[in-house]
């Protein structure tokens, strides 16, 4: 079997991130996982089971802190950037939302570029279908190529659109942006 790939996963304490973590963890024979989580009591409790697992490296920190991000990006083959501030909190705290969602991707891009071979790192960025606006009648579905049309006062969508543009304009060799739907 080939060498295990290193995966840096952001947002592992959130709904989508934890589901992604669980899927990757089931394949820990193929991956070494690095998780950057805020050091809250809730998060520490959630991940205490994995604290002594050599295939999981738990980093307690902040996506808006470049040094924390750099420590996690260093050595990563893949970065799955699922973390961020989401609605409804994103709309109550617009300044924090911008700092978190835009600052995090700026730190990730900068950290990738600081690697000895940045072209070897693959980035998966998670955006949102909210970037294309609401889906009121008569349009209930989204399609590839739909224009960016953010709803008024949707700070989450604004921050994710700016962050996605930063990825697209970053000059990174390997990246993709996926726009997730709502999670219930």
Predicted regions: what they are:
Residues 103-153:
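Conserved Rossmann-fold NAD(P)-dependent oxidoreductase catalytic core, especially the SDR/UDP-sugar
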Residues 29-42:
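Conserved glycine-rich Rossmann-like NAD(P)H-binding loop of the short-chain dehydrogenase/reductase
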Residues 85-86, 129-136, 181-184:
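Active-site segment of SDR-like NAD(P)-dependent oxidoreductases
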Residues 5-29:
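N-terminal Rossmann NAD(P)H-binding glycine-rich loop of SDR-like oxidoreductase domains
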Residues 52, 56, 60-100:
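NAD(P)H-binding glycine-rich loop region in Rossmannoid oxidoreductase-like domains
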Residues 99, 136-177:
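Catalytic helix-loop patch of NAD(P)-dependent Rossmann-fold dehydrogenases
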Residues 10, 36, 79-83, 123-129, ...:
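SDR active-site strand-loop-helix element
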Residues 64, 96-107, 154, 158-159:
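Glycine-rich NAD(P)-binding loop of the Rossmann-fold in SDR/ketoreductase-type enzymes
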